[in-house]
Swiss-Prot record:
It is an enzyme of class 3 (hydrolase). Pathway: Cofactor biosynthesis; 7,8-dihydroneopterin triphosphate biosynthesis; 7,8-dihydroneopterin triphosphate from GTP: step 1/1. It catalyses: GTP + H2O = 7,8-dihydroneopterin 3'-triphosphate + formate + H(+). This is GTP cyclohydrolase FolE2. The keyword Zinc does not apply. Keywords: Hydrolase. Its EC number is 3.5.4.16. The gene is folE2. GO terms for molecular function: GTP cyclohydrolase I activity. It comes from the Bacteria. Belongs to the GTP cyclohydrolase IV family. The keyword Hydrolase applies. InterPro entries: GTP_cyclohydrolase_FolE2, GTP_cyclohydrolase_FolE2/MptA. It comes from Pseudomonas paraeruginosa (strain DSM 24068 / PA7). Converts GTP to 7,8-dihydroneopterin triphosphate.
Length: 298
């Protein structure tokens, strides 16, 4: 008995002729290797459907090509290779291939002073595309940090000065008395407000960038801000964090400018955008600032 040939409906033509910008799948579960660890990722994979007569693409071919990302460290040549397989398997249908990966790798981060360390999550999105032999990759990275309001800090200092003048009116306190007063609840009568804040970085990676610069960009951004949220801490680390906040007072405008300056000096960026959000503890709304830069632009 002869085996039946299974029908391939995707090869049929359509009566409604129209090329499509993107056809594919989203939310595909996929393990990838990042920074020496296996990370659960979600992939959106697709190609353009440029043949207006074709009814559809071969989605299973895209799905199977993603297996090329499972073994070995995730890097840009590997991503480009997968996109090329997308196009090779749709040579008569498609000219453009797309792949987006959403993942949240963990990086071990040291405490500020003590020998402790802990894991921190870094939400990451990789957008890649291939068209006419040109490969482009954009990396989206979210950083979390603390921001202390400069205005609130000035107001708190003023209240401390007023309390000092009130408590020592007509007196000439000695050094020990002032030191004891500063260490009491009577001395520090007000503190500035601060909040957990986030920075969304989108970096268009240069053509000669091969590796995935997750840790490099995380270090660059956190160093520029100076107040990255911590993992495991002792009291000495908490005190160092309080000092860092006091020495890095920031409006959202200050934070975005710090990050912008740092990324301008990053050689693997062909362009970038920065968006910071300060989830105000004083207000019921957020403070937001954005900037953008493109290499070679005026």
């Amino acid at each position: 008995m002869n085996a039946l040939t299974l029908p391939d409906i995707a090869r049929q033509t359509t009566l409604s002729t129209l090329p499509l910008d993107w056809v594919g799948m989203q939310g595909i579960a996929l393990p990838v290797q990042v920074a020496g660890q296996t990370v659960a990722a979600e992939a959106d994979a697709g190609v353009s459907l440029d043949d207006p007569q074709a009814r559809g693409i071969h989605m299973s071919r895209l799905y199977l090509a993603l297996a090329g990302l499972e073994d070995g460290e995730l890097d840009l040549p590997r991503l480009r290779g997968v996109l090329q397989r997308f196009l090779d398997s749709h040579a008569d249908l498609s000219r453009r291939a797309y792949l987006r990966l959403r993942l949240a790798p963990l990086l071990r981060r040291p405490a500020l002073v003590s020998p402790l360390s802990g894991w921190k999550r870094y939400p990451l999105v990789l957008d890649t595309r291939l068209e006419n032999g040109t490969f482009q990759a954009d990396l989206h990275l979210e950083l979390t940090y603390s921001s202390t309001c400069p205005c609130s800090a000035a107001l708190a200092r003023q209240l401390i000065q007023e309390r000092f003048a009130q408590d020592f009116a007509g007196q000439q306190p000695d050094h020990a008395t002032i030191l004891a007063w500063l260490g009491s609840s009577d001395g520090i009568v007000a503190t500035p407000h601060s909040q957990r804040s986030s920075a969304q970085l989108r970096i268009g990676l240069a053509e000669d960038c091969a590796g995935l610069p997750l840790e490099e960009l995380a270090d660059l951004g956190e160093c520029a801000l100076g107040t990255a949220v911590q993992t495991a801490v002792k009291r000495a680390d908490e005190q160092a964090f309080a000092l860092a906040n006091g020495q890095n007072l920031m409006f959202c405008e200050d934070a975005v400018r710090r990050l912008h300056r740092a990324l301008r000096g990053y050689p693997q960026a062909r362009e970038f955008s920065v968006r910071v959000v300060h989830a105000e503890s004083l207000h019921a709304h957020d403070a937001v600032a954005e900037s953008h830069w493109q290499r070679g632009a005026a």
